[in-house]
Amino acid sequence: DEMENCPLCPKLLERTELFGGIIREKVLLQTEPDVWMPVYILIPPAKEGRPGCVLAPHGHQGAGKYSVAGCREIPAVAEAIDRFHYDYGLYLAKLGYVALCPDARGFGERRDKAFQKEEEEAFMRGTCFHLAHMAEPLGMTVAGMNTWDLMRLIDYVEERGEWRTDDLGCVGFSGGGLQTLYLAAL
């Protein structure tokens, strides 16, 4: 019934240079004890001054952070990007913002694979339905857990200290819009 604070223990898993000088980092953050959230961080080319940040939570049916960060290696993700303009994190980085694209609980690398196959179609969906049914008897909601994780992501931005926190935004489509709305309320 309550989220437990803990050290973030950030782990840099990969750092890749994309086209146009954008850097994509994959970072793993501990949002609660033994609860880890993978995040793609898209960093624009260096300019004068520190860039602002935008949290870019994903919605449903987009394979978590992959589509928002513009990862086109998986054909179904590329199709979602083309169909729904789902790569808004990458677009923000092209505009000069640092875009932080996390996997919400039940999606991407955080989905419960016991309920799904490893096929591409299953990868596009989440398992938040199952997670919700496990959380509710404990007095918790998936939306609340995801909002907590976004708050911890802001903690990481502040702890890292490389980017402006007075120019911090959040934008998402569908379920990512819901996460944005709840985060703004807190």
Q: Across the structure, where does each feature detected by a protein language model lie?
A:
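Beta-sheet entry/capping signal
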Residues: 38, 52-54, 96-99, 167-169
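Short, hydrophobic/aromatic alpha-helical segments in well-folded domains
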Residues: 25, 42, 87-88, 153, ...
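Cap/lid segment of the alpha/beta-hydrolase catalytic domain
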Residues: 49, 56-151
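An acidic- and aromatic-residue-enriched active-site/binding cleft used to recognize and process polar
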Residues: 32, 44, 59-60, 104-107, ...
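Short amphipathic alpha-helices and their capping/turn segments at secondary-structure boundaries
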Residues: 39-47, 89-92, 182-185
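N-terminal cap/lid segment of alpha/beta-hydrolase-fold proteins
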Residues: 2-55
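Primarily recognizes the serine-hydrolase "nucleophile elbow" in alpha/beta-hydrolase
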Residues: 145, 152-186
